[in-house]
Amino acid sequence: MEEFQRYLELDRSQQHYFLYPLIFQEYIYALAHDHGLNINRSILLENAGYDKKFSLLIVKRLIARMYQQNHLILSTNDSNQNRFLRRNKNLYSQMISEGFAVIVEIPFYLQLKSSLESKGIVKSHNLRSIHSIFPFLEDKISHLIYGLEILIPYPVHLEILVQTLRYWVKDASSLHLLRFFLHEYCNWNTPNKAGSSFSKRNQRLFFLLYNSHLCEYESIFIFLRNQSSHLRSTSSGTLLERIYFYGKIKYLVKVFVKAFQVNLLLLKDPFMHYVRYQGKSILASKGTPFLMKKWTYYFVNLWQCHFYLWSQPGRICINQLYNHSLDILGYLSSARLNPSMVRGQMLENSFLIDNAINKFDAIVPIIPLIGSLAKAKFCNVLGHPISKAVWTDLSDSDIIDQFGRICRNLSHYHSGSSQKKSLYRIKYILRLSCARTLARKHKSTVRAFLKRLGSGLLEEFFTAEEQVLYLTFPRASSASQRLYRRRIWYLDIICINDLANHE
């Protein structure tokens, strides 16, 4: 986001939060294009056509059309009458929505930067790694007992998202443009498929709206958590303040003025940790089942009474962490009991002590991974490898490089797994899929092709994980072989991969 600095040198008092004119600037679409190249890279498939959609000529043509009068007038009777989006509707809408998402992120970025500077955090990018959540779980979750797995409800009406964003963006024209997109592509009377299609084509804008909504919900939750504990939550400092937030809290206290303090006394728990990922969140605690049920009650009432979201208690599951696995970011994580025996000796007497401690464990889930490979046409639903037909036009070296890249990325992302058997099976499927693809290209059988090629094809896949490991540890180090079998979390991963986004 530092690219904004050279374009935002104007005095803030002169801007008056008028973001709408930025939609006519070419550099906004250049920033959106650069962001798309970095984020929209797939671990399984390359987005080959993404670069062609954002040519300078198309951007200039789009801006010229927007300058013409009445092109952004929304027709409530027939959306086909809208001349602006009659041609290249999907392309133009995607370009405008991604550019609009870049613009709306500006007030968020400015307040976040000022918040980080006030706290003395200079290099905020060091905190961005997705894998940074797992060392936290290793340190904390083994000492906790219960966990709430929460499915965060979506807003029943997208106007709620607009109202939430209204307190961040003071420009009414920008909000009208946002409503234009929501009405045009998420017709309120159609099934959810339309909204799903909109969110997939305009991921950056959709995630911005959704995260701004979650920020409001988490603000009140962290307020309750801080009031109920003698130890203040360290994570609350990362949430940005809003002008109207204290008004909400004042209203909340006014509603529960009689029973507020009494109820909060029942929720005191200094050992409480909250983690959110995708549309789920985990609230882990060292408390009792009664305390967990009280928090479930508060979550349901908070969603229904203050955010107008219909939710049921069944969306919140209370689990004991030592015998339940958490499905988080492509891993099955658990805090299982690990028995150990210690021999002690006092004078002439020796004795054995049985001790069971909780140990954090992260396993690669095989079934969702096979489902993701089947969706990408590397195997069938049973896990039997098949050829990748769309890659048969590539050269042999390019095909091997494509499969090798996928294996290296999988080894990189799932390097923190304590049990690598599932990962080895996935790599075996990819290896045979590569062999079938090459055999199909040369119109031969897999056995004949492998016999003719030799072991050169297999070397790429067997050494993939070692190449990732030696990026950190020297190949000549004697300790590398021992570390190869241990769990290593790579803290440079800032994007979740396709296989962790299984549905």
Swiss-Prot record:
Sorted UniProt keywords: Chloroplast, mRNA processing, Plastid, RNA-binding, tRNA processing
InterPro entries: Domain_X (IPR024937), Maturase_MatK (IPR002866), Maturase_MatK_N (IPR024942)
Position of the signal peptide: none
GO terms assigned for molecular function: RNA binding
GO biological process terms, semicolon-separated: mRNA processing; RNA splicing; tRNA processing
Primary localisation category: plastid
Compartments where found: Plastid, Chloroplast
CC terms in the record's Gene Ontology section: chloroplast
Family: Belongs to the intron maturase 2 family. MatK subfamily.
Functional summary from the UniProt entry: Usually encoded in the trnK tRNA gene intron. Probably assists in splicing its own and other chloroplast group II introns.
Name the UniProt record assigns to this protein: Maturase K
Organism: Panax quinquefolius (American ginseng)
Species classification: Eukaryota, Viridiplantae, Streptophyta, Embryophyta, Tracheophyta
